[in-house]
């Protein structure tokens, strides 16, 4: 596995899909073509195959990877030099040839890094790679997703939020980012056709009536929860009216103003 950089974006990219979880950037003069021979600035080897996307904070790049049977977080300089590598705990390998136990992206508040893995390992590190705390979330149930756990952690103004969405063991969890202490938890289990309760989507932070809320997409439902205590504020259903099986939630929702764009099913 190699990590390549073709564009250096001046602003921070602190989480999966960037600042507002849209994956979009301001308009500008960016290369329209990226390949091994054109606009490639550098590439750096990684320990093993992982599927997390990198995040960027100031002059550093962070991502996850398996490393000799362990879950690891890596820090790089902006010229591709690996600065540090920290192992968190034993990895749980991907189920498939192209799978990985290191799919969720790291998230940062600018002071610390937060990383989550298929194994259930959840850790907080400082920007130099020192572990400040870590937890084992396997007590909430093993990952049973066919294509390996991929939901990234997210931050609210107060909490580190983790969503686990799979058959029979789906949870919305909030932790104190300073200590790792569990602040609140909410079950999120629904009866669905086979595999329709599997979700790889990452939650989104929104505003609801002037207060922070967490938007969660999975199990054929888009739900909003209070960021303070996890209580459900509203839920939208009817995404699979014919109750077809194997409609898995893969793509994360995108919020534009007061509209949530929700990809689902086959060609919808």
Segments predicted by a language model, with ranges:
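Noncatalytic, solvent-exposed loop/strand surfaces
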Residues: 3-268
């Amino acid at each position: 596995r190699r990590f390549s950089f073709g564009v250096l974006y001046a602003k921070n990219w602190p989480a999966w899909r960037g600042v507002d979880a849209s994956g979009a950037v301001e308009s500008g003069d960016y290369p329209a073509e990226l390949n091994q021979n054109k606009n490639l600035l550098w590439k750096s080897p990684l320990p093993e195959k992982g599927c997390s996307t990198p995040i960027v904070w100031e002059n550093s790049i962070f991502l996850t990877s398996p490393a000799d049977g362990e879950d690891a977080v890596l820090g790089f300089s902006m010229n591709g030099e690996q600065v540090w590598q920290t192992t968190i705990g034993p990895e749980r390998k991907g189920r498939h040839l192209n799978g990985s136990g290191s799919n969720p992206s790291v998230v940062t508040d600018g002071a610390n890094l937060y990383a989550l893995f298929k194994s259930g390992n959840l850790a907080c590190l400082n920007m130099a790679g020192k572990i400040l705390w870590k937890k084992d979330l396997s007590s909430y149930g093993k990952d049973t997703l066919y294509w390996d756990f991929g939901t990234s952690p997210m931050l609210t103004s107060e909490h580190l939020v983790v969503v686990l969405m799979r058959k029979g063991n789906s949870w919305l969890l909030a932790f104190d980012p300073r200590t790792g202490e569990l602040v609140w938890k909410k079950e999120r289990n629904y009866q669905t056709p086979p595999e329709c309760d599997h979700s790889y989507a990452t939650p989104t932070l929104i505003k609801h009536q002037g207060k922070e809320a967490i938007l969660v997409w999975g199990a054929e439902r888009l739900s909003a929860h209070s960021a303070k205590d996890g209580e459900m504020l509203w839920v939208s259903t009817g995404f699979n009216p014919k109750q077809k099986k194997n409609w898995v939630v893969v793509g994360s929702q995108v919020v534009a103003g007061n509209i949530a764009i929700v990809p689902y099913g086959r060609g919808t």
